[in-house]
């Protein structure tokens, strides 16, 4: 009730002020009709009379508020009258009204931070996570890999499943091909032969003339570099110096006296694709006939040291020249992975274990190969013994034994294939005519 009375008193005071102003205005207009000298302009009224009326109205408002004791209630009451016309003169904003905007800003910041943390966690542990530990040759390392598999395998398997769903082959999901792992390799071989229109049983052998041209160009480049920079001579001398500690004590230092790298090229022919017999049609291999008729010569000299009855009692000079004249064989080439073959050495180094990943080009020669030599020997200083048959047969046997232990079936050599994905560091550009004339000029 007090609030209503205060509101009524406010409206009455405003009305009184308005009536007083209207009365003064009518009185002023009356005076203006009687005498133009006593006329008060609007500017003078706003400057002199209006402040007095407003001050009087304000004093009455303060006195009434003190009398009723409801000054606090009247200030925060609902806006009516003048307060309704001027909202800026209403009650001040309470601290509780700013709480909603502040809490919204804090919630927005916390939400953004939580999303960033989740993204960082996902990228670190699902995208850039390390693979499972490599399994060593011993039983202890395999046990460790099995024990560590409980922590690493779920994460890597989840990542692999996530990425495998993105890869498709021929419009089909990649997981469809990985489910049947037993027949997967056979299915791939059959698909390759079918889509390339190649029948292993009836397809005629190929001549490989284009391949002979490429191989001839490569060998020619090697020969030019060997003649210009003596790379082969330096390599052989370095090899002999490294192996000098393994020579028996009755041999002196070995020196190279002659080197002939030939001028002919190997001829590859009669290429045919066959199934690899040990794997039951799970791998393809290419069989190529190779024929080389050239003269590749290496001449060395050394001394036989006579250390009995005293050290360096006498020495016997020895000169040996070995020339390969003919080589014929059937070359077998295939692609494989490291899991499909067993190393011949029992112990492997860390670098060999790191190279066991990826794909390899495997090649070997058939046991019925043909290798012809021309071996010349000269022993002695004054009374010389020349071309002893026993020495020739011994040298030829050692060369063939070295070759069979490394390149003849069932032994083979493998070469790791590089990554075939295009990379910026492997990108080159052909030189223009201006750059060939001036090699120092770089392209703009």
Swiss-Prot record:
Residues 204-418 form the SMP-LTD domain. It is found in: Endoplasmic reticulum membrane. Residues 1-107 are lumenal. GO terms for cellular component: endoplasmic reticulum; endoplasmic reticulum membrane; ERMES complex. Residues 426-444 have a biased composition (Basic and acidic residues). The SMP-LTD domain is a barrel-like domain that can bind various types of glycerophospholipids in its interior and mediate their transfer between two adjacent bilayers. Component of the ERMES/MDM complex, which serves as a molecular tether to connect the endoplasmic reticulum (ER) and mitochondria. Components of this complex are involved in the control of mitochondrial shape and protein biogenesis, and function in nonvesicular lipid trafficking between the ER and mitochondria. The MDM12-MMM1 subcomplex functions in the major beta-barrel assembly pathway that is responsible for biogenesis of all outer membrane beta-barrel proteins, and acts in a late step after the SAM complex. This is Maintenance of mitochondrial morphology protein 1. The gene is MMM1.
